Each structure stands twice: as structure tokens, then as C-alpha cells.
Regions:
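Short proline/glycine- and acidic-rich turn/helix-capping motifs at secondary-structure junctions
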Residues: 245-250
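A short interface-forming secondary-structure element
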Residues: 213-230
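Short, flexible, solvent-exposed loop/turn segments with mixed acidic/basic and small polar residues
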Residues: 134-136, 207-210
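ATP-dependent adenylation/nucleotidyltransferase module used to activate substrates
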Residues: 1-163, 231-243
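Generic alpha-helical secondary structure
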Residues: 9, 104, 186-193, 197, ...
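Mid-to-C-terminal catalytic subdomains of enzymes
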Residues: 117, 148-152, 158-209
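A structural signal for short secondary-structure junctions
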Residues: 210-212, 241
Length: 250
């Protein structure tokens, strides 16, 4: 597949040809999908392994996306799980670091065991402008970020992903753990949030169901809601949180 025009083929070739065997941390989102697509153009597919964490904080549709993306490129796909640390579950400001550390520790073990040269992730150039505690773990495990190194933005990576995998639904997504606010993270809450958002996601793209003492519904994109929408949203949420008040922000 032809690389989109703003990327110089020579620059891509120079970058990727430095690596023989790589693991791509494939979340199922657009950034890591773009990394896998670009990697597959310059590294033999047999020398690429896509790995995906399948713990409850990862939405099931993204796990399925990851599997389909790897399959479409004839790249081996390996799901894995991690043990959540107590530090992660306490849900403080470093939650993302603790999570990323455990994930990358598992991937590093796979890399060593199976003899791969490097780990690629989907960090893009725009991520450098955001507060991302997980970046510390990326440095600790010497993870390589091709999009960042090549100056590829979030918008560009989304274009690559959508152009390459036309049947995949890509959404700007954060994990289920981010939906739990000012309380400890529990498996129960993560699974409930997923069940709710699975029903609502395609009707209301960018929806975020936040769980704290009560429920807050937010929308990443501007929406116009009718009374029937508000009733429908409340009905779906009440199936899982009957005892909580619901605030819908729009």
C-alpha cells in the first residue's frame, strides 16, 4: 500500500530498516494501527509481532480491532494480560504510569523470550504537548515511538489508519479506567462502563460515562440532545447503576 504523500518513502525506509525483528504494542486505536501499517511496509511481516493487553481497562471493541488489523496484514497477534498493581487501583494522578509500566514490563518479557530487537508504540508527535505520566514508562523500557520520531501527528496517524483499514471503527479513545473518578478502580466499574458505552457509542460518538459518587455523562464532540435522548441515556445507565444520580452534560 502506498504511503500517504506527506511522508517521504526514503525517510520511512531509513527509519524502519534499522530494525530486523520488532514487537508493536497494538492497542486497537489509530496510532498503533498506523505504526503497524508503516512497519509492515519495510519490515518482513514474519519478523513483526503485534501484542495487545486484554485486561478489563481495554475496551473489547479495541481488542477486536487489534486482532482484525494484525490479521489483515498477515502479522502474528498475541493477546496478553497483566496483574494490576495496588498503585494502579488506588487511582491517583500516576495511574497511567503504573498501568503502562506493567504493560511494558510484560511486553519486554515477550521481547526477551522471543528474541525481538525492539518494541514500537503509538506515541505521536502531538503527545509531547500533553501531560502523559505513561511516557516515563516508555523511557524506562526503551520503547521506540516511530510516529514521534518521524514527526507524525495525531491527525496524520488517523488518516493512515482510516486509509489502511477501511472496515475498522477508529475512535479517539481513552481506557475504561479513566472513567472512574475520585474512587478506587474496580473490575466491576470498568465492566459496567464498557457495557453502557458499548450500547451508546455508535449512537453518541465520543460519549464518556464517568463513575464517582454519582454518574456524569460527557461528550467529546458537541451534541444536540432531545428529551427522548436524555430518557434513553438515563434508562441504559440505570440498568447498571440504579442507585446513582445521573448528570448529563451537553
Amino acid at each position: 500500500m502506498k504511503v500517504i504523500s506527506f511522508l517521504e518513502a526514503d525517510s520511512l525506509k531509513t527509519f524502519f530498516k534499522k530494525f530486523n525483528k520488532v514487537i508493536v504494542a497494538l492497542s486497537g486505536g489509530a496510532d498503533s494501527a498506523a505504526v503497524l501499517q508503516l512497519s509492515s511496509q519495510f519490515i518482513t511481516p514474519e519478523n513483526i509481532l503485534a501484542v495487545t493487553c486484554v485486561n478489563p481497562h481495554v475496551f473489547g471493541y479495541e481488542i477486536e480491532n487489534a486482532r482484525k488489523i494484525a490479521d489483515s496484514l498477515n502479522i502474528n497477534w498475541k493477546p496478553f494480560t497483566v496483574q494490576y498493581s495496588a498503585d494502579f487501583l488506588k487511582n491517583d494522578d500516576l495511574r497511567c504510569y503504573y498501568c503502562k509500566h506493567e504493560i511494558l514490563k510484560s511486553i519486554e518479557n515477550i521481547r526477551k523470550t522471543e528474541g525481538f530487537d525492539a518494541i514500537f508504540d503509538g506515541t505521536n508527535i502531538d503527545d509531547l504537548n500533553d501531560y502523559r505520566p505513561g511516557m516515563k514508562a516508555i523511557k524506562e523500557f526503551n520503547v521506540i515511538s516511530p510516529l514521534k520520531e518521524l514527526g507524525i501527528s495525531k491527525k496524520d496517524s488517523l488518516h493512515i489508519a482510516k486509509s489502511s483499514f477501511k472496515t475498522i471503527y477508529f475512535n479517539v479513545e481513552s481506557c475504561a479506567a479513566t472513567r472512574i473518578v475520585n474512587k478506587m478502580i474496580t473490575f466491576e466499574d470498568m465492566l459496567k462502563v464498557e457495557k453502557i458505552e458499548d450500547i451508546l457509542r455508535y449512537r453518541y460518538p465520543g460519549i464518556r460515562v464517568r463513575v464517582s459518587e454519582n454518574i456524569s455523562v460527557e461528550f467529546k464532540n458537541k451534541v444536540s440532545l432531545k428529551k427522548s435522548d436524555l430518557e434513553f441515556l438515563s434508562k441504559i445507565i440505570k440498568l447498571h447503576y440504579a442507585d446513582k444520580q445521573i448528570k448529563i452534560n451537553y
